[in-house]
Amino acid sequence: MAELPDGALMQRAAAGLAAAVADLLGGAYGRRVVLLVGPGDNGGDALWAGARLARRGARVDALLLAEQAHEAGLAALRAAGGRATRDLADLHPDLHPGPDVVVDGIIGIGGRPGLRPDAVAALDHFAGVPVVAVDVPSGVDVDTGSLHGPHVTADLTVTFGTHKAAHLVDPASRASGALHLVDLGLDLPPATIEALQPHDVRALLPRPGSDAHKYTRGVVGVRAGSGTYPGAALLAVAGANSGLAGMVRYVGPEAIADRVRATHPEVVGAGRVQAWVVGPGGGDDAARMLAEARDDGVPVVVDADALRHVDGPVPGCVLTPHAGELAAMLDVERTEVEACPLDSVRDAARRWDCVVLLKGHHTLVADPDGRVRVTTTGVPWLATAGAGDVLAGLVGALLAAGLEPYDAASVGSWVHGAAATEASGGGPLTASRVAVEVPRVVRETLAAPGPGALG
């Protein structure tokens, strides 16, 4: 990228920010805008964007929350007819009953998490007014997505160049609201966290060649279910029997095997496999299930009850805990995992020398080298009994089909979330219905136009 004139990046950012604010408001003319301005470049972005909005007919007031403000941006705002003050009580009288939008330019990506009391007071004063955050909501931990104190909760975050971890990782992702990315034309460093897009998934999904047969497409085995939880076996098999592998084998209690075969007549019994799925509904048999699967020397998806029996490094495996299960494995409180899931999943992947898929609002997949992918597909209705069993089976099928554990876990999670969106249609869903929608999601993803970024 050619060297840009001084201030060009800020002008690009401000232009994108102003356009996003105007779009949110349905136009700028006659609208009332308050800028909350800190001392850094985020404050400068807000001031320059405010100047652009003022020139388009908005009434713009800036509340300066630091002794210093971006001088050129402040001068531009005033030249365009905007006002600036350091006193909340001195804001424009026309703001009664309140502004149409508040622009959060308090702290940028280099700031420390948390907010000062004057910023908290300003946010409280404008409670209920839509908030647009500049780059990231002020006060969140940009690098980990954790929250360490007061922070902005935005309706819209306008970010520049690339998304940040805080936009994608809970709990900070919930504070970001809708995301709008402004391309600054930058040469970006390698990403520390990835969110797969449809073209990425399409490039990774296994496709049978013209000479394929059921064995070359992979055989996945499922060891799941017990007298207490027979349905877990049916759901794990449903996920595995999505068509992504050539064959599914079920090994378990004969009474459950009869139900599996009645529901899924394609499923066969014991034999050689390329991957195992172990643990869903396994109960007291989970330890034996895991040991026998590990003895085969093939990749294993370790879920649910089997997670309690992981007592050392398990290279080649994929662990699929939710926050409570991971907390028990790490011997910490669940709240600690939920407060910083990114650090927790990376710690787990290093500790057990394998891929770890941490299920949640935004599911995270980490490998022992520190790579992380986040899944942004799915709907809140996916928080339902049995959904994790389907996911375990789906990941197992992808492993059997030949994907590396990191790719199998992240692609499986993406497809699972997309299938849930289809199954939901805006309303409740069941885990069984998610499994039914997987082939359609795969078919539509493979057929969609666009480049294969990872292929």
Regions found by a protein language model. Give the residues of each.
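Small-residue (G/A/S/T)-rich helix-start motifs and N-terminal tracts that mark the onset
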Residues: 1-65, 154-156, 163-304, 308-318, ...
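Nucleotide and nucleotide-moiety/phosphate-recognizing core
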Residues: 18-106, 114-134, 299
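Polar low-complexity intrinsically disordered regions enriched in Ser/Thr and small residues
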Residues: 76, 84-85, 148, 180, ...
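Short gly/ser/thr-rich secondary-structure transition/capping motifs
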Residues: 81-89, 138-142, 201-206, 301-307
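Internal gly/pro-rich beta-alpha loop/helix module
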Residues: 100-101, 106-193
